[in-house]
From Swiss-Prot:
This is Guanine nucleotide-binding protein G(o) subunit alpha. InterPro entries: Gprotein_alpha_I (IPR001408), Gprotein_alpha_su (IPR001019), GproteinA_insert (IPR011025), P-loop_NTPase (IPR027417). It comes from the Eukaryota. Residues 174-182 are annotated as: G2 motif.
Length: 354
């Protein structure tokens, strides 16, 4: 009889070895394919993170991209000024100079004619500049938490001469500061540290959330964005719910969701630059009445972080937290590098390769 293997048995062994090899290769390939889901409430900075990935990993914006963002910059700028003018009516703040009424009418007429994406005429630019330095407008800007105003309002309105120039072309920073509501799902692909990333940005407003569900399969990690600066603001959608309380509720539902028991969760406490300015004058007790700490960045941001981390009900799950400024490319590059290292370690462990 002997111990030689029959041709059939040899073929079966070869097949088995090949399957094992393929499984290992598949495992290594799976470890290289990274699916990231960007979640968070509306205006938490998700789309800005996507733009940063384009800058950091895809060579930035083309001149064609720059051109396409021009009307967005014009619209964001004039719409921000209009939001302030309308809020002055609601908050009963008069113009410092009555002559600004006619300037305000000119700006409102541009919106009414739906010409907000056009370059500013000389006349319009002069009116906007006069309005921007008006004491009433500046007073209303200081109360921006009482109405809905783009974070980038001051950034753009402080630079009207540059934006109004005939040869104006958006800079990288201008593009990062633009705001367009995300509807549907935006997908970005890039490679980094020998990994293939697919990043999905889904709309944060309540009406957009039902579109998330089919993105949930095979997610390697979730990046959950929170705007730290929104602790004293209410939602666009209902004007009564505190934005940070809404974020906490949403984080709770994501963090403890059955879909995500095996998924790494990375928390970006974003807009730290705005938070640092705001915390000096607007108390954290607006959102957290039980807070007794100082109105200082370190203590207040640590408290916010602790509130989010406390939502995690699983002792086996670690939340990886970073304080970020999504408009700062160096900061996001540094943070994303750290995030990738965590993903690599967790992923290899999950594939039994670490």
């Amino acid at each position: 009889m002997g111990c030689t293997l029959s041709a059939e048995e040899r073929a079966a062994m070869e097949r088995s070895k090949a399957i094992e090899k393929n499984l290992k290769e598949d495992g290594m390939q799976a470890a290289k394919d990274i699916k990231l889901l960007l979640l968070g409430a509306g205006e938490s900075g998700k789309s800005t993170i996507v733009k940063q990935m384009k800058i950091i990993h895809e060579g930035g914006f083309t001149s064609e991209d720059n051109k396409q963002y021009k009307p967005v910059v014009y619209s964001n700028t004039i719409q921000s000024l209009v939001a302030i003018i309308r809020a002055m009516g609601t908050l009963s703040i008069p113009f410092g100079d009555n002559e600004r009424e006619s300037d305000a009418k000119m700006v409102l007429d541009v919106i009414a004619r739906m010409e907000d994406t056009e370059p500013f005429s000389e006349e319009l630019l002069a009116a906007m500049k006069r309005l921007w330095v008006d004491s009433g407008v500046q007073e209303c800007l200081g109360r921006a938490n009482e109405y809905q105003l783009n974070d980038s309002a001051k950034y753009f309105l402080d630079d009207l001469d540059r934006l109004g120039a005939k040869d104006y072309m958006p800079t990288e920073q201008d593009i990062l500061r633009t705001r367009v509501k995300t509807t549907g799902i935006v997908e970005v692909h890039f490679s980094f540290k020998n990994l293939n990333f697919k990043l999905f940005d889904v709309g944060g407003q309540r009406s957009e959330r039902k579109k998330w569900i089919h993105c949930f399969e095979d997610v390697t990690a979730i990046i959950f964005c929170v705007a730290m600066s929104e602790y004293d603001q209410v939602l666009h959608e209902d004007e009564t719910t505190n934005r940070m309380q809404e974020s906490l509720k949403l984080f709770d539902s994501i963090c403890n969701n059955k879909w995500f028991t095996e998924t790494s969760i990375i928390l970006f406490l974003n807009k730290k630059d705005l938070f640092e300015e705001k915390i000096k004058k607007s108390p954290l007790t607006i959102c957290f009445p039980e807070y007794t700490g100082k109105q200082m960045y370190q203590e207040a941001s640590a408290y916010i972080q602790a509130q989010f981390e406390a939502k995690n009900k699983s002792s086996a799950k670690e939340i990886y937290c970073h304080q970020t400024c999504a408009t700062d490319t160096n900061n996001i590059q540094f943070v994303f590098d750290a995030v990738t290292d965590v993903i690599i370690a967790n992923n290899l462990r999950g594939c039994g390769l670490y």
